[in-house]
Amino acid sequence: MIISDHHRFAFVHIPKCAGVSVKHPLRAIDTTAGYFDRIGEHDAMGRIHFAHITLRDLAEHFPGEAAKLRDYRAFAVVRDPNQRFLSALFQRLREFKQLNQSDITRNRIEQEAADVIRYLESDPVRLDLEHVHFNRQSDYVFHAGERIVDDIFPIERMADIVAYVADRTGISVEEERRNRSTEVRFAVVRPLVRLLRRPYAALVPYALRNHLRNRLVSAGIYGDVNKGAMLPAGGYVDGFVRSYYKQDFALHAASL
């Protein structure tokens, strides 16, 4: 989350909705100095991702910041719930199961989806750190039946987001999304890519890596992972997503 007292402006970071791309340049105007951009311990909530605190928890534990969201112009980015659920599964496998992108198979995705669904169906008071990316998007827009966030953009309209942020703050946001799931298109070289990934990440700055990756995508050497093939429509997971995230589907559709 970004809050700018100077601009009376706020960005609510919904997990897995291009938030890193939008938030990165806005750090320059963040009055909280990155307080809501970290993983850490909270006295009441335990170990949490401060970037992804829902509006309910914000109102309870950070009433001052919650009041600013009401008073300032707040915006958020939303995403198709099916795409977002898959993206969250990929991140969970990479971040908490230490799997490389190229090691994530359809069977592994299906197994992980079943585990996540069991956890969500247990209806915890709040989602723990390992499941925070599966929070409903609506929990970052509404609180106690009231819409708190003024402006909602779909991830498909990055050009409009760029123009909106520039108009409100004078800050330039790149249209190219960060944290995309990409892979080399040629399976024969993927073992070599896996071998070199860690030293490459350690030696080459992120900005340069991102630039090179975009060039490789343009050249057809790298491409977005075909996540749609991992969990086909009409199955058990699809049914769960459509039920659990019903309000999110409506929220995304209304933003298009």
Protein language model regions, located:
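Membrane-interface amphipathic segments in extracytoplasmic regions
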Residues: 1-256
